[in-house]
From Swiss-Prot:
Site feature (Transition state stabilizer) residues: D77
Lineage of producing organism: Bacteria, Pseudomonadati, Pseudomonadota, Gammaproteobacteria, Pseudomonadales
InterPro entries associated with the record: UROD/MetE-like_sf, Uroporphyrinogen_deCO2ase_HemE, Uroporphyrinogen_deCOase
UniProt protein name: Uroporphyrinogen decarboxylase
Gene Ontology cellular component annotations, sorted alphabetically: cytosol
CDD domains with a match to the protein in the record: URO-D (cd00717)
Length: 354
């Protein structure tokens, strides 16, 4: 593989010295970009775009043509695993992801097939290797997966949910069945992320989007436990360097110390946690990623710049910070405002790395 020209992101995740704070955005390849919307129209729909290797590669690279980002993230969806397990993923306009089949019983869990990521999700592996080739060492490529708990919520609810009543019904009423499902999913995620690493991903992130809807004990038992299992099962060295792992639980700031103990190299923070306070709590155990409120991108550019300056100041000097939003960028953001955010990180962060 080509030598990496910009390894700032990987170095920061390992808390090694960098010249400035690296920056990327969750959902950086997305609907806020007119060029993304044009490519998606070519593909027909979101799922076809994920499964079309040249087009998935094209949209992954689009934000890098526009902005001085320090990482690319595979263009895909967290729900590829349940789709490969036969649940029949589809998207309804304005309603988000849906499944034709749902998991509600012990029999449903027992009927789930064992997944082989390299054959069942070969389109993802092809996308990873193609993107890696096209990047030609420009920046590292991030692979990713949903967490077992987050995947389970979609599989049980049949889509997204405000209350998660069906998922919680299974969790509280038949915890042993829920544990079997989560264990099955953890094995699938290990296989999936290791497949991405073998195909060329240089770092991986586990998205625990819905971990924050759980009570503290339930988070430890039904979400963090399985992410810890995944981290334990991942390939941690490839092409002669460490493959860092980032764990991101939305609304998980209260469990930061526990998450920092799961074996990951970095913890993603949403915007509800103060990053200076988070750094004081974890010390130099893990790097931190985040954590500007994505809605700040609606503000005037000068205000965005001020917020970036404030977050940099709160984190303080030294490595171990990857700047990002606290969640994905929203579709109605002006690309120029995203540019102002990235530019501010590039221009203002050097002073913290003297």
């Amino acid at each position: 593989m080509t030598e990496l020209k910009n390894d700032r992101f990987l170095r920061a995740l390992m808390r090694q010295p960098v010249d400035r704070t690296p920056v990327w955005m969750m959902r950086q390849a997305g609907r806020y970009l007119p060029e993304y919307r044009a490519t998606r129209a070519k593909a027909g729909d979101f799922l076809s775009l994920c499964k079309n290797t040249p087009l998935a590669c094209e949209v992954t690279l689009q934000p890098l043509e526009r902005y001085p980002l320090d990482a690319a993230i595979l263009f895909s969806d967290i729900l590829t695993i349940p789709d490969a397990l036969g649940l029949g993923l589809y998207f309804e306009t304005g309603e988000g992801p849906k499944f034709r089949k749902v998991i509600r019983s012990e029999a449903d869990v027992d009927a789930l097939p064992r997944m082989n990521a390299e054959s069942d999700l070969d389109y993802v592996m092809n996308a990873v290797s193609t993107i890696r080739r096209e990047l030609n060492g420009r920046v590292p490529l991030i692979g990713f997966s949903g967490s077992p708990w987050t995947l389970a919520t979609y599989m049980i609810e049949g889509g997204s949910s405000k209350t998660f009543s069906e998922a919680k019904k299974l969790m509280y009423g038949q915890p042993e069945v829920m544990h079997r499902l989560l264990d099955h999913l953890a094995d699938s995620v290990i296989d999936y992320l290791n497949g991405q690493i073998k195909a060329g991903a240089q770092a991986v992130q586990i998205f625990d989007t819905w971990g924050g809807v759980l009570s503290s004990w339930a988070y430890e038992e039904f979400s963090l436990r399985y992410m810890t299992k995944i981290v334990d099962g991942l390939i941690r060295e490839s092409e002669g360097r460490r493959v860092p792992v980032i764990v991101f639980t939305k609304n998980g700031g209260q469990w930061l110390e526990s998450i920092a103990d799961c074996g990951a190299d970095a913890v993603g923070l949403d915007w509800t946690t103060d990053i200076g306070n988070a750094r004081a709590r974890v010390g130099d155990k893990v790097a931190l990623q985040g954590n500007m409120d994505p809605a700040m991108l609606y503000a005037p550019k000068a205000r965005i710049r001020q917020e970036v300056a404030d977050i940099l100041k709160r984190y303080g000097s030294g490595s171990g910070h990857v700047f990002n939003l606290g969640h994905g960028i929203t579709p109605d953001v002006d690309p120029e405002h995203a540019g102002a955010f990235i530019e501010a990180v590039v221009e203002l962060s050097g002073q913290y790395h003297q």
